[in-house]
Amino acid sequence: WQGDRGNAAAEVILDEKAEDLELIADPVMNEKGNLSEGIEVRAEFQKWISTYTGSNWIPEPRSYRLPEAPKGDKSYSADVIYGSQMEREKLLEKNGRIIQPIWITVSTTQDAKPGLYSTKIRVRTEQGGEQSLKLKIRVLDLKLDQDNEYYLNLWQYPYASAAYYQVEPFGREHLQIMKRQMRPYMEAGGKIGTASIVEEPWYHQTWCDYPSMVRWKRENGKWQFEYGEFDRWTGFLLKEVKVSYIECYSVVPWGNVLRYREDGKEIEKQAEPGSEFWTEAWSAFLQSFVQHLEEKGWFDRMILAMDERPKEEMEAALNLIATFPDRHGNSLKVGGAVVHYNKEMWDRLFTVTPHLSALANEEIPQELFREIVRRRRQEGKLTSIYSMIHDYPGIFSMSDPGEAAWTIWYIESCGADGFLKWAYDAWCKDPLEENVHCYFEAGDMFLVYPGERREKEPDVRVSPRFRMLEEAIHDVRKLCQMKKVPEYEKKAEQLLDSVRCFYGKGKSNGVGTAGFMEADEQIKRELAEEVEQIGRAHV
């Protein structure tokens, strides 16, 4: 379509050792041989990285700091769309052959002229050898609406990039890096920002630290709060990334541990929701936070978020938050990634996000969920679906990138407003070399990669998984446009109704599988056929 983006893939196979490789995308030409306008083709090598699938479970109790990932049982995944130059040492050689994947992205502007176009993708070796492939592009006389109403929510870890590039968190240099790093998220439809209001909201489940953007202090029995980093990050998200809302984690963090400074000492204290200490501490915070947000004009943009917390803890938080309204009597918005359906709880939440399995396993019947979404939408509330570890299809390094597309289509078939996933950029120590996690599937922690530290202006590198996620969001937006045309409304709905749920049988672990869910070969073939069928249906 016009104003669209699509993807293609290729491979270079070399029977003998090569030196550095170079990739060139020739100018795009129309059928008359004239240079086209409004069509951009990017061809980039994919970089192989070491992956480890993990055990796909978190032991309880677990240590605050993650253990090292096991050294063995690793594989390789071409998960980084790296660039047009590939140095010899980055090539992967096996049995005397080099297999080098290529990712091709085609973007069209709103005023690209409909028609058939072509270009050549050329690969050169340092010795002067060259091979090429012809790429044909058909631009349809259809415009993709520029208004992107899809609610994509990929949790961000800005401290990870500050640590990777060794810059001051939220300083000028860091925010310049983050501006480039968040561009793919914004272009894909990212609508939600992520902020921390306590130390390690997820009990340090990543290699990188996630400190609190709000500094908690208690001096002479009185609570004090410093918002410097929170303000710089919030201002950046609202101005540069143009998010609609910012989720603040969390009134009920994993582990229910509150860390703060008291009389010059670092204190770590258990704070069970509803307890006397928890109520005292969070009452002080909420009173301060509401006042601060009103002064900054941000009150309506904030969501106090909770992630997979028990019903009793969420109720305690909701009850306390309601006692600290703004000057107009409005309470802060509250949201949550929830495991089970509870009508009373869901009615109190501005954002509700059940796990994909709740729909797939019919714990929440699809028709009921669609009705809930419609009702909540009329009330101005948001309803999304999230995926996580052990899902098949999944969005991991060892997953077929098409599984990311299926995920978006399946969620759309359920009627949700959007998709949530942990995480966008929770990098490990050396993400351009390996993306391991001791517990989770490789790639679950991030969908984008950093630039090389030696680069003058390091730019983010995305994964094929991210590109297919983005392409599927474009497909969903096209279907939404088609529904507005009477003659296509029923066809669009039938197409979405045809999306089936593919879940495999349980398996504890194994490189190349998606956690507990491993599909048999028939399901894999059927999924591949469905991805192709739905992807072509828009033509």
Task: Locate each region found by the language model.
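Short, solvent-exposed loop/turn segments enriched in Ser/Thr/Gly
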Residues: 3-9, 100, 112-120
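Short edge beta-strand/loop segments characteristic of extracellular beta-sandwich folds
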Residues: 9-13, 105-107
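Surface-exposed binding patches on compact interaction domains or structured appendages
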Residues: 15-104, 112
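Aromatic-lined carbohydrate-binding surfaces of glycoside hydrolases
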Residues: 98, 106-108, 118-125, 131-328, ...
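Catalytic domains of carbohydrate-active enzymes that cleave complex glycans
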Residues: 257-260, 266, 270-339, 416, ...
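Extracellular glycoside hydrolase catalytic/binding regions
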Residues: 328-342, 346-363, 394-412, 425
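Active-site clefts of carbohydrate-active enzymes
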Residues: 376-406
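Substrate-binding cleft of secreted/luminal carbohydrate-active enzymes
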Residues: 395, 400-446
